[in-house]
């Protein structure tokens, strides 16, 4: 089975479900790090906010600005090279300037400085949750490796380079999605969920954003993410032609080595898909800038 190494973030073939590391080298490195951490008991934990640029992250930014959450020691966001243009427009046009007004710098960490953000490995392995047709005609979705590989592992390496020995990592998951909350597998990182702690739902986040007089942020995702709704795909196609062209090009690149793999669940090439947004998707899209 394919798994993500808990140390280096690389995908590997695990012979047993319990395996966490791709090699003895990674396993030994973790053991050595844990031994070193035991020597550092009592080390002050740095507060690190992982910003995603969307609704929940914007609500956290407002709570920080209003003094309802403390200023983090580090505010970080990874640039995986595939994020949508409208996300960066919001981050650079709203989030970063307003955070800088209170002395909080949102650090943008390029994934490419640490790891290859290509959607394909040299072997042809697809790193994103694309779709293919099974032997009996069913739709098969690939596992999701991109988030851990391009974001979490990169953030950890950046923090280590900054000399962070222990971290309290804030994640923007709201109270209505608390099932997504998890505990860290790393001894030096404690995952915290400030919105869950405060009982703030996504609807509450939208109210906070509106009440503060801010423009509502778009839903964040990569322009080539196969898990997008039809509404999101259609929005990209109609309003962000550069992102659309990149997604089409990425699919064609994948199909050079994997001709039966597609970015849309219909198993049809993107340029030929007839997108059919649901009423619920369209109502959600009305929360985002550009369609108001």
Question: Which stretches of residues belong to each language-model region?
Answer:
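BZIP DNA-binding basic region
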Residues: 1-37
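Nucleotide-activated chemistry modules centered on ATP-dependent adenylation/adenylyltransferase
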Residues: 37-292
């Amino acid at each position: 089975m394919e798994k993500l190494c808990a140390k280096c973030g690389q995908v590997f073939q695990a012979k047993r479900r319990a395996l966490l590391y791709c090699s003895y080298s990674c396993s030994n490195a973790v053991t050595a790090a844990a031994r070193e951490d035991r020597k550092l008991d009592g080390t002050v934990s740095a507060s690190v906010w992982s910003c995603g640029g969307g609704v929940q992250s914007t609500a956290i930014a407002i709570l920080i600005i209003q003094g309802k959450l403390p200023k983090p020691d580090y505010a970080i966001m990874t640039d995986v090279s595939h994020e949508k243009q409208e996300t960066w427009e919001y981050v650079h046009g709203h989030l970063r300037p307003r955070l800088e007004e209170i002395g909080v710098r949102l650090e943008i960490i390029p994934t490419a400085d640490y790891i290859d953000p290509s959607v394909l490995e040299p072997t042809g392995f697809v790193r994103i949750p694309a779709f293919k047709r099974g032997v009996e005609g069913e739709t098969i979705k690939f596992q999701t490796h991109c988030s851990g590989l391009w974001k979490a592992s990169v953030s950890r390496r950046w923090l280590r380079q900054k000399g962070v020995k222990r971290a309290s990592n804030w994640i923007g998951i709201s109270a209505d999605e608390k099932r997504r909350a998890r505990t860290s597998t790393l001894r030096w990182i404690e995952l915290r969920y400030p919105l869950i702690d405060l009982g703030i739902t996504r609807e509450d986040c939208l109210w906070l954003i509106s009440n503060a007089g801010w423009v509502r942020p778009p839903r964040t995702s990569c322009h080539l993410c196969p898990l997008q709704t039809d509404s999101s795909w259609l929005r990209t196609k109609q309003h962000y032609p550069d992102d659309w062209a990149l997604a089409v090009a990425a699919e064609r690149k994948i199909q050079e080595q994997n001709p039966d793999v597609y970015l849309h669940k219909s198993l049809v090439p993107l340029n030929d898909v007839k997108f059919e947004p649901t009423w619920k998707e369209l109502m959600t899209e009305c929360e985002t800038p550009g369609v108001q």
